[in-house]
Each structure stands twice: as structure tokens, then as C-alpha cells.
Amino acid sequence: MREQHRTYLVTGVAGFIGFHLSNLLLSKGYSVVGVDSLTDYYDVTLKRSRLEILHSFARFTFFKEDIANDDFPKTLSSVNFDVVIHLAAQAGVRYSIERPREYLDSNIVGTFNLLELSVSRGVEHLLCASTSSVYGSNNNMPFGESQKCDTPMSFYAATKKANEVMAHSYSHIHGLPTTMF
């Protein structure tokens, strides 16, 4: 795929990082397919304002969709993309104690759906956001990529660690180029 014609699928496109990354990609001439469920965990009005800005680019397509839905991959059947940047997640440590099912659905099932979609579409690369919460009770500072991350202290951290392990296995089994960050 020629670099200038690359299309990025960005999940969590209306969030802070998703919006700014998509805005940068679009301003550099790339195409972006954005997905966001527009949950009310963060201000929905702000998310809609961000989407208005992204919609000013002709190369931006938006799908209001929950990546944890079984039909999510079918929603994207009309669009092509080369790279997946997976930023969507249910965030928040405290909230994960109160509502663990939402984290299971959004973070684990949603990531599984993205992994399956990436393999079935033969994407060039999958990039997935993790969190510093995966370091858990690790007291070694600063955190390093080679440190153990097997002591999550919240369900949120556990779901993000599970995402890392799932992505690693898909990379190994299916040859899916994957980067966790």
C-alpha cells in the first residue's frame, strides 16, 4: 500500500487521544475510519464537538458503534482500511470495581472483535493502547517494558493486561503485526 493512500481505522475516535491522532492523520492527507460508541463516561457533548471537526475532512468516515457488539465487524463491511489503531476502552480504575461487566465487554470482547477483524481483513498492522495500570504493585520506577506486569491491582488493569496477552497470541498464531503501547 502506498503510504499516502493508507487508511487508518481508529477506535475511540471521539476520545482525547483518538481525536488528536485522527486530526493529525487527516491533516497529513491520510484517510480515517473512526469508530466510537459515544458512551457517557466522558462528556458526550465534547465528543460530538470533536467529531464535527473531524467531519470537516472529506477523508473521514464515522461509525457510531460499540466494538463489543457481535455485529460490529459487519458494520464496517463497506469500508477498507490498512492499519488499525485500537484506542477504545472502558477506562477508570474505580469504576471497574463498581461495574466490572462493562470492562469485560468493552475491553476484552471489544478487543477480541478487533483482533478477529484485523486478521480477517489482513491489515498491515494493529496498534493497541494499554495502560500504566498493568504494572500494578510493581515498585520499580520508572516502569520499563521488560518489567513483570502480572500483579494487576484493579479489574481495569486486568482487562488491559488480558488485551496485551490476547494481541500477543494473535500476532504469534496469525502473523498479525502488532504493537502495544
What are these language model-derived features?
Residues 1-181:
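N-terminal Rossmann-like NAD(P)+-binding domain of SDR-like oxidoreductases, especially those catalyzing
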